[in-house]
């Protein structure tokens, strides 16, 4: 009898141990399952279904493409570069095999769906009207703006793809490069700098909240007093647009960088630029007469708007302030 009771006790203990193991395993599986998605706050609200480790990402802005590449991620699909067939020259090698899904202003929703993405990254300014369509295809995260501060957007994208630490590293590396360059520039940062862009029918002065403006400000450059006064009259500190050559004197500075938009209507834009740069007002600018008016690449200085372009812009600063002296 005692033998039977002993055997029964052993059996019950074994059942309890197995039950505990199964319960533990079930709990463990539940934790793994719950960790397969993440919650991300973005311009369109809060998404709680973002894959923990997305593998098939479609990106719908040029600056977003550069951000993903900097994070070590190659998207399966991306919108076409503003200039290039279909990518900017400096992105061609990195973007081999990536599907072109249309323009930033008009993504091809069907092409995106065919790629079966597990995450879509876009921008409220560009694609707010089709957010619901995109979100029905895959979890979709939107940045708020394209004003010029690419660091904010890169931080959001890094969080969305679960690479927040890598995002911080990318930004820290850029900031260190800026700091090192600022030290090399020394008192040259006391010079005033102006940034001008030509488009057909419109000429622009880019100020402190623009893509080049933010970088120049980080380097410590000043703006000419005329522009300081000009932008006091504006609500934004992004750009001043004009079609009157009488505004050319406002473009002057110790150093002037100018460029022409060539992604669309290139001939008309170049014709407009030539009309301005051949005028007597332009030729009489201090920067022009001193040989400190430099024509630079529109893609790098404003069109692309991403981390790679930002580094190329720093290359230009090194060239014109250090290497040509």
Swiss-Prot record:
Q: Which residues carry this modification: Phosphothreonine?
A: 302
Endpoints of the signal sequence? 1-20
Is Phosphoprotein set as a keyword in this record? yes
Domain Fe/B12 periplasmic-binding, by residue range, is: 56-325
Q: What induces it?
A: Induced by iron starvation, repressed by fur.
The Gene Ontology CC terms held by the record are: cytoplasm; membrane raft; outer membrane-bounded periplasmic space; plasma membrane
Lipid-linked residues (N-palmitoyl cysteine)? 21
Q: Give the Phosphoserine positions (modified residues).
A: 290
The principal location of this protein is membrane
What's one Pfam family here?
Answer: Peripla_BP_2
Q: What happens when the gene is disrupted?
A: Strains lacking this gene show a reduction in growth stimulation by the iron-hydroxamate siderophores schizokinen and arthrobactin compared to wild-type.
Q: Which GO terms describe its biological process?
A: iron coordination entity transport
Give the UniProt subcellular location, in the record's own words: Cell membrane; Cytoplasm; Membrane raft
Specify whether Transmembrane helix is a keyword of the entry.
Answer: no
* Record keywords, A-Z: Cell membrane, Cytoplasm, Ion transport, Iron, Iron transport, Lipoprotein, Membrane, Palmitate, Phosphoprotein, Signal, Transport
S-diacylglycerol cysteine lipidation sites on this chain?
21
How would you describe this protein's topology in the membrane? Answer: Lipid-anchor
Annotated coiled-coil positions are: none
What quaternary structure, including any partners, is listed in this protein's UniProt entry? The complex is composed of one ATP-binding protein (YusV), two transmembrane proteins (YfiZ and YfhA) and a solute-binding protein (YfiY). Interacts with FloT.
Cited function: Part of the ABC transporter complex YfiYZ/YfhA/YusV involved in import of the iron-hydroxamate siderophores schizokinen, arthrobactin and corprogen. Binds the siderophores and delivers them to the surface of YfiZ/YfhA.
Family, according to the entry, reads as follows:
Belongs to the bacterial solute-binding protein 8 family.
- List the protein's name: Probable siderophore-binding lipoprotein YfiY
Organism lineage string? Bacteria, Bacillati, Bacillota, Bacilli, Bacillales
